[in-house]
Amino acid sequence: MYTQAIDLAPGANPVRPEAASARDAAFEAAIAQDRKVEAQDWMPEGYRKTLVRQISQHAHSEVVGMLPEGNWVTRAPSLKRKAILLAKIQDEGGHGLYLYAAAETLGVARDDLIDALLSGRAKYSSIFNYPAPSWADMGAIGWLVDGAAIMNQILSLIHI
């Protein structure tokens, strides 16, 4: 049930569906019927926590993804490519801001999410930890990351 078993302490048992409250059962039924759940709607705390973790990880990846690209702004092979790279960096920052705003609607403070990133408690896409010593490396990393994101989005649409 929404990956909360990952967060369990060793030896702990997850809550069994039969032990869940009527409110939990109603929420599970709504999910099973593919009903939309809005941020202000009641949801189990584990579900909300998982959403915040997923959204913040995505936001952090957008922001951290700007860093290797930013290193290449002054070394881009042409003015046209420099302008394209600056636009891509700006897009990544904007995506991160949108995602932080979405997480805030779930009741967390943006400052807390950023503090978790800066302290190393939060996760982000590890591909950005690898060096991009050439313009081609930087392009390949961007292509692979964006391509993987597009495939995830397409596959999620297929399974609707």
Predicted regions and their residues:
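Acidic/His metal-coordination segments adjacent to aromatic residues that form catalytic metal sites
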Residues: 36-56, 117-143
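Alpha-helical scaffold segments that form or flank carboxylate-/histidine-based iron centers
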Residues: 47-58, 76-95, 134-138
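Conserved small/polar residues in nucleotide/adenosyl-binding loops
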Residues: 1, 158-160
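Non-cleavable N-terminal signal-anchor transmembrane helices
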Residues: 1-56
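Alpha-helical transition-metal enzyme core signature, strongest for iron centers
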Residues: 55-69, 88-103, 120-124, 139-150
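Helix-loop segments that flank and shape redox-cofactor active sites
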Residues: 44, 65-87, 149-158
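Conserved alpha-helical segments that form or flank metal/cofactor-binding pockets of metalloenzymes
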Residues: 2-24, 88-116
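Short, highly charged low-complexity linear segments
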Residues: 8-26, 122-131, 149-157
